[in-house]
Each structure stands twice: as structure tokens, then as C-alpha cells.
UniProtKB/Swiss-Prot annotation:
InterPro entries in the cross-refs: 16SrRNA_methylTrfase_J (IPR007536), SAM-dependent_MTases_sf (IPR029063)
Gene3D superfamilies assigned: Vaccinia Virus protein VP39, YhiQ-like domain
Organism: Yersinia pestis
Protein name (record): Ribosomal RNA small subunit methyltransferase J
Catalytic reactions on record: guanosine(1516) in 16S rRNA + S-adenosyl-L-methionine = N(2)-methylguanosine(1516) in 16S rRNA + S-adenosyl-L-homocysteine + H(+)
GO biological process: rRNA base methylation
């Protein structure tokens, strides 16, 4: 496993031994000079940009905040991502989210009843996801179904997509995309995130293995101004104000 250098910090109230366990598990090497810091607080694990402290910490929270609000008051099956993966009454596809990020869309699909396996190759992001899942699993309200429906695999999608069993009906891709220079200051979260992981320059290579793995379809989330992934025109799309969800059929002929 290749090691990633990041500043590792522990705040008052955090378990003092947890940081070294975290570093060992995810292959992290502490670098006091690094701009990016992974901070263990008494409540959770956070990612911070040390040269821009006003941006605050980035963390995964499935229990409260915007995720809880989206689960309770969002569009439910009417949400664009739900329509794109094909959720219908009596049909809840199994989904592999091959670019999990902070797990937002994966959580929405799991909350609607889908079984979702998240793939995340960046060890820092995987550590944040794992921390959010751990807290979510312990929650009295969402824990019982979250444990059943939402899981994490720390692996590169370029290799993992070939080997996943059983095959999911849907593979979901939401690769990082370079933001327009002219756009307003990118949301703080995106700025911190892109400082860590950059753009997914190899994302075009995901479409073919995703279509070979999915038994029904691949869904690719793109900014409205972005070219289709790998330059391949989509069969259909669900369009929102600022994004579109491009839909591609599976490339595997179903058995007769």
C-alpha cells in the first residue's frame, strides 16, 4: 500500500491512541508541514485546509445536518439521482457508487431502500467515509437500515470494477470535474476536497468497465457544461438546473 502524507492532529477529548490506529489502517504518514490536515476531534474525523482555517472542517455526517434534512424533506423517489438509477415502485436496484466522495448520493439511494456499495480510492476520503459510517451505524434511528444497505470498499475503481460479485444492476459515477475559472468562489467543501484529491484525470477509463459490470445501466453525474464522459454520447439523461445524469446501457448482453 502506498502511503499518503498528511498532517495528523488530535484535539482535546479525542482518544489519544486512535490517531496511530487510523494512520496504520489507512496508510497515512503524518507530515507537520502538510497543508491538508486530518483532525480527530472528540466527536468525529475532519479534513481541514490549514492555510485557510476559515473554510472549517469537512466531515461525513449521515445522521444530522443536510443529509438528515435531505432524507426527511428531499424529493425522495422524485430526486434526480433516484430517477436516473431507475428506482420505481417494487424496483430498488443494487448500486455500486464507484466514486463515492463524501457519500451523499449513495446515502440518498440507501435511504430510499437500495443496497449501495461505495468505492473510494483516496485513503483520506475513505477514512472520512468510514468514520461517518461508523457513527451512522450506531445511530438508533438510521443505524439498523444503514448497516444493511450502505457499505464501503477502499479500492481503486479502475481495478475493483472488474472483480465485484455479485454484479450490481447499476454503477454510479460522479468523477471530480475541473470547475470553470469564471464561476463564483467554489463552495468551501469543493476547495478543500480538490486540494486533496484534484481532478479525476483518469475518469474516462471508468465508463467501459462500469458498463461491463452493471447488469442494467451506468449513471454518470456531470456538470451541465461538461462533455460526456470519455466523449461517449449518453442514451438518455435526467437534467437538473446545474447537472445532468447521463444514462448508458450495460454493455453485457443478458442471458436468454
Amino acid at each position: 500500500m502506498s502511503h499518503v502524507s498528511i498532517c495528523l492532529l488530535s484535539e482535546a477529548g479525542a482518544d489519544p491512541g486512535a490517531l496511530s490506529i487510523l494512520a496504520d489502517r489507512w496508510g497515512l504518514v503524518s507530515d507537520d508541514q502538510a497543508v491538508m490536515a486530518l483532525v480527530l476531534t472528540a466527536e468525529r474525523l475532519e479534513l481541514r485546509k490549514r492555510d485557510e482555517p476559515k473554510l472549517g472542517g469537512i466531515y461525513v455526517d449521515f445522521v444530522s445536518g443536510t443529509q438528515a434534512h435531505r432524507r426527511k424533506f428531499g424529493g425522495g423517489r422524485g430526486e434526480a439521482v433516484a430517477k436516473a438509477v431507475g428506482i420505481k415502485k417494487g424496483y430498488l436496484p443494487r448500486v455500486v457508487d464507484a466514486t463515492a466522495g463524501l457519500g451523499r448520493d449513495a446515502f440518498v439511494l440507501a435511504a430510499l431502500g437500495c443496497q449501495v456499495q461505495m468505492l473510494e480510492r483516496n485513503p483520506v476520503v475513505a477514512a472520512l467515509l468510514d468514520d461517518g459510517l461508523r457513527r451512522g451505524y450506531l445511530d438508533a434511528e438510521i443505524g439498523p437500515w444503514l448497516r444493511e444497505r450502505l457499505t464501503l470498499l477502499h479500492a481503486s475503481s479502475l481495478t475493483a470494477l472488474v472483480a465485484i460479485e455479485p454484479r450490481p444492476e447499476v454503477v454510479y459515477l460522479d468523477p471530480m470535474y475541473p470547475h470553470r475559472q469564471k464561476s463564483a468562489l467554489v463552495k468551501k467543501e469543493m476547495r478543500v476536497f480538490q486540494s486533496l484529491v484534484g481532478a479525476d484525470n483518469d475518469a474516462d477509463g471508468l465508463l467501459a468497465p462500469a458498463r461491463a459490470l452493471a447488469t442494467k445501466r451506468v449513471v454518470v453525474k456531470r456538470p451541465d457544461y461538461a462533455e460526456p464522459l470519455a466523449g461517449v454520447a449518453a442514451q438518455a439523461a435526467v437534467v437538473t438546473k446545474s447537472h445532468r445524469f447521463d444514462i448508458y446501457p450495460s454493455s453485457v448482453t443478458p442471458p436468454r
